[in-house]
Amino acid sequence: MTHPLQATIEELWERRTELSPQSPPTTIAAINSVIGDLDSGKLRVAEKIAGEWFTHQWIKKAVLLSFRVRDNRVQEAGDIRFYDKVDTKFEGWTEEQFRQGGFRVVPGTIVRKGSYVAKNAVLMPSFVNIGAYVDESTMVDTWVTVGSCAQIGKNVHLSGGVGIGGVLEPLQANPTIIEDNCFIGARSEVVEGVVIGENSVLSMGVYIGQSTPIYDRETGEVTYGRVPPGSVVISGTLPKADGKYSLYAAIIVKKVDAQTRSKTSINELLRP
């Protein structure tokens, strides 16, 4: 079913260079409505339909257009001041709104308006960008970056210093996706629209982009852009054909088993 604002956003995109903070109020209201629905979780940039991820390009366009129709303004958090076009998600929130949200936000966390955080999530000091979606019972640990429009599933653990790539700059066709029940090890980076299949575990310091070879030790197969569900992945190298050098690769060493789960399971005591 087509969203009532989709045609409007597509039309505005075709004449995006004409847009400014002085654009007609109806134009700005249409864009802000999409951002508001992203913020509340009514819309998301990508969703799984019939087992496959589908990106709503028009919503991503609305996120980009929002930068055209807003002026920078001074924002304050106590004695700290900022100057930006995007409001913070929790500006003006009351204690009751946080209670209704049902998640924890530790001091030092920055979440931009237009991102969604579901119940029972925990946000340690981290950065969650506009358009991102953080699902239920997910832990976003210290110094994690959740990039623009990234999709993070349920019961995910993003360990300290993890980077999940965004789509706005450099411009990407599809968001980076971490599916349900994944564990992403400390200082790992997943970018450029890569999909990490559900129940997978990435070891510490694994880097995966669209050009990173993903080698399955069991089958010998090399793939790109997607880690199959239930994979345990470590950093490694693959030798080149001439044997003169090796290049970085992500290595699937095995499938997740009970031992793996015992080491990476979430701790309910830390949830709200």
UniProtKB/Swiss-Prot annotation:
Keywords: Acyltransferase, Amino-acid biosynthesis, Cytoplasm, Diaminopimelate biosynthesis, Lysine biosynthesis, Repeat, Transferase. It comes from the Bacteria. Coiled coil: none annotated. SUPFAM superfamilies: Trimeric LpxA-like enzymes (SSF51161). It is found in: Cytoplasm. The keyword Phosphoprotein does not apply. This is 2,3,4,5-tetrahydropyridine-2,6-dicarboxylate N-succinyltransferase.
